[in-house]
């Protein structure tokens, strides 16, 4: 690159809680500041803003509206009225965002707007407003993983995504979900998850628990599969526990506990709530259960690899792209298969699995390697060329 590229990153969260936001933070850490100058637009003031400013990144606050709805069974007319009301709010938010960007960043010549998530249209509009390039980071399926539907419809959303100057899909499954076959500059590479400097020795003294970790505990994240498999395994009779990390609705927690109660396992299930510092849990767990029905990638799978925790992963979404069955972890297609794997893994020496999984994580998910990939995307976009990694 002959000049520093100034990039405005658009985030949809004011607080770092979801995988997309954490991955965006890893991305910004990975950048070579002599080549790329990052600016960040956030929807509010929170702990994430402080983390970015500690890295020397200028942040501005402006509306970032996710124009999506969860699935509902209301009648068509009611949905239309609601959609019109939401669209009016969205347009006002966009106008306000454009004004704030114009005022706060008037001294910057922005080259690229980088949307950090599939779930926002703000980046598309701001790129048009600023007459600059647009890179769209596709980190979610939206419908398969979050059960969201865009108010503008999937046909129109895909059309907008494929009109971006470049897209970055975090797995082949996500790319296939969103990108047309002949779309140019459709890159695919995994998220950055860790810095190599954070690598520590594997804890060889595992404790007797299986770990389930997700921002939210719900059926679509497979929390019910984890419970059913644990109950079927009977491992609680040998003193093993099932530990849940993540936000959980009271009613849903009671539903899961009822399953455990039916087999006498309720004293062997712990709900520890949302936890930002997950490393101690991964490093000591017997195994991590990735049960999400359609995980786009799964940062927690890589967290497990990184911390020497064997992974049992559901054979759906992007998970099979991370796990080579029998070599870096184990895949399952049913609750019965998961239960059987849980019974097997407590009897095995998992040293080779842990070593291969860790090496895979080091080769594919470090900040140190990630920044170079972003540079290739930006250079391609600025040169108006086409290239694939």
Stretch-by-stretch model annotation:
Residues 7-8, 203-221, 227-230, 243:
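Conserved donor-binding/catalytic core segment of Leloir-type glycosyltransferases
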Residues 255-273:
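Nucleotide-activated donor-binding/catalytic signature segment of Leloir-type glycosyltransferases, i.e.
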Residues 325-326, 330-336, 344-350:
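Conserved acidic donor-binding segment of nucleotide-sugar-dependent glycosyltransferases
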Residues 18-26, 217-232, 254, 302:
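A conserved mid-protein helix/loop that constitutes part of the nucleotide-sugar donor-binding site
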Residues 274, 293:
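Aromatic "clamp/platform" in nucleotide-sugar-dependent glycosyltransferases that forms part
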Residues 41-47, 213-214, 241-255:
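Glycosyltransferase donor-sugar binding loop
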Residues 60-63, 158, 162-198:
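Donor nucleotide-sugar binding/catalytic pocket of nucleotide-sugar-dependent glycosyltransferases
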Residues 310-313:
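Short hydrophobic beta-strand element within catalytic cores of glycosyltransferases
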């Amino acid at each position: 690159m002959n000049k520093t590229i100034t990039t405005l990153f658009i985030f949809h969260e004011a607080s770092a809680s979801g995988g997309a936001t954490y991955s965006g933070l890893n991305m910004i850490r990975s950048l070579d500041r002599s080549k790329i100058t990052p600016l960040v637009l956030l929807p509010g003031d929170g702990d994430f803003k402080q983390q970015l400013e500690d890295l020397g990144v200028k942040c501005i606050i402006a509306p970032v509206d996710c124009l999506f709805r969860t699935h509902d069974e209301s009648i068509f007319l009611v949905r239309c009225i609601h959609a019109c009301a939401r669209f009016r709010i969205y347009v006002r938010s966009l106008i306000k965002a454009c004004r704030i960007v114009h005022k706060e960043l008037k001294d910057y010549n922005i080259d690229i707007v980088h949307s950090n998530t599939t779930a926002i249209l703000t980046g598309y509009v701001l790129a048009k407003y600023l007459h600059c390039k647009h890179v769209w980071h596709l980190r979610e399926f939206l419908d398969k993983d979050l059960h969201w539907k865009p108010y503008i419809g999937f046909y129109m959303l895909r059309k907008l995504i494929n009109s971006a100057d470049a897209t970055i899909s975090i797995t082949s499954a996500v790319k296939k979900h969103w990108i047309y076959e002949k779309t140019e500059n459709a890159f695919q590479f995994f998220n950055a998850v860790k810095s190599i400097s954070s690598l520590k020795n594997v804890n060889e003294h595992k404790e007797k628990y299986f770990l389930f970790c997700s921002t939210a505990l719900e059926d679509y994240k497979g929390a019910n599969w984890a419970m059913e498999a644990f109950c079927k395994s009977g491992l609680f009779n040998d003193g093993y526990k099932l530990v849940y990390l993540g936000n959980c609705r009271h009613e849903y927690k009671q539903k899961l506990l009822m399953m455990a109660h039916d087999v006498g396992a309720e004293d062997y299930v712990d709900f520890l709530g949302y936890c930002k510092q997950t490393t101690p849990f991964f490093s000591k767990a017997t195994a991590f259960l990735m049960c999400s029905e359609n995980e786009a990638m799964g940062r927690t799978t890589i967290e497990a690899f990184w911390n020497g925790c064997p992974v049992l992963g559901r054979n759906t979404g992007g998970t099979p792209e991370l796990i080579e069955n029998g070599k870096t972890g184990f895949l399952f297609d049913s609750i019965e298969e998961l239960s059987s794997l849980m019974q097997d893994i407590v009897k095995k020496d998992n040293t080779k699995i842990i070593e291969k999984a860790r090496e895979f994580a080091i080769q594919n998910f470090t900040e140190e390697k990630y920044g170079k990939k972003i540079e290739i995307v930006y250079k391609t976009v600025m040169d108006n060329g086409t290239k694939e990694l």
